[in-house]
From Swiss-Prot:
This is Uncharacterized 8.0 kDa protein in 100 kDa protein region.
Amino acid sequence: MTESIMEGFLNLAQRLGIGKEALQALELNGNQNDRHHHFAPFLQSGGVMAVKPACKIVVRNHGLAILGVLFGLI
């Protein structure tokens, strides 16, 4: 179940222009102790255009799991 949810969020992120490589980089470079990160500046500096600066990706401690992508709601 968790893997299918993860695949769904990866597909959503790719449709929004956030590449899989950028998501993997977020997993490697993210602070694993802090579950909430604002990655838009990181994505833009990595050559990937974020949809909005308010794009927020939630990362879980045991690996990358996009729980939500919120636009303008933060």
